[in-house]
């Protein structure tokens, strides 16, 4: 991704798993906080908890394996948001749901992550107030119809689904 160039240009703090955080520091990223699954990193106004994500993790230069992937439970402004990242469906999402999620951002691309049907199951496990699909339609193997996913979520779970186009935002 673009994490290294963005963090160097902006000075943004990057929160990552320990191995990835160590790698980013070695690449000259100035502000890195490295944690691990189950750990909560607090900052003014909120916190980030690193949670499991079931996927592979690699960096393209020499196919470096920078540790295990993670999802994020972010708390700020009285809201709790789960960013699943690249992952499959897994039963411990039920425990993540106990965090009291306002929003869950879930992959629906299939092929490399869970697809729409499993993402609907994840919504049942997580019980968020709102779900936002991600990680789809960026290249042919992960082509999906996000509006069909929205219909599936709302019909099968009663949870509201918001489809955002690239560059769109949503105020909570």
Where are these regions (language model features)?
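Short glycine-/acidic-enriched loop or helix-start segments at secondary-structure transitions
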Residues: 1-3, 24-26, 60, 92-94, ...
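Divalent metal-coordination and catalytic microenvironments
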Residues: 2, 14, 48, 86, ...
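Short, glycine/charged-enriched secondary-structure capping and boundary segments
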Residues: 4-6, 29-30, 63-64, 96-99, ...
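Core dinuclear metal-dependent hydrolase active-site scaffold
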Residues: 35-98, 165-172
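Metallo-beta-lactamase
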Residues: 74-129, 134-142
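Active-site metal-binding motif and surrounding structural segment of the metallo-beta-lactamase
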Residues: 1-25, 31, 98-105
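Structured loop/turn residues at beta-strand edges in well-structured enzyme cores
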Residues: 8, 27-30, 46, 67, ...
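Binuclear metal-ion centers of metallo-dependent hydrolases, dominated by the metallo-beta-lactamase
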Residues: 13, 21, 25-40, 120, ...
């Amino acid at each position: 991704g673009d994490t290294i160039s963005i963090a160097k240009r902006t000075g943004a703090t990057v929160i990552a798993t320990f191995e990835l955080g160590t790698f980013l520091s070695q690449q000259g990223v100035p502000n890195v906080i490295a944690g691990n699954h189950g750990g909560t990193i607090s900052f003014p106004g909120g916190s980030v908890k690193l949670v499991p994500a079931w996927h592979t993790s690699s960096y393209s230069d020499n196919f470096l394996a920078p540790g295990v992937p993670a999802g994020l439970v972010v708390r700020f402004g009285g809201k709790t948001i789960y960013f699943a990242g690249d992952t499959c469906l897994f039963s411990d999402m039920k425990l993540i749901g106990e965090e009291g999620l306002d929003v869950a951002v879930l992959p629906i691309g299939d092929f490399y992550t869970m697809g729409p049907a499993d993402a609907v199951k994840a919504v049942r496990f997580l019980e968020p107030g709102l779900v936002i699909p991600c990680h789809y339609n960026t290249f042919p193997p992960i082509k999906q119809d996000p509006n069909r996913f929205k219909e599936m979520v709302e019909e099968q779970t009663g949870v509201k689904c918001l489809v955002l186009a690239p560059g769109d935002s949503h105020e909570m």
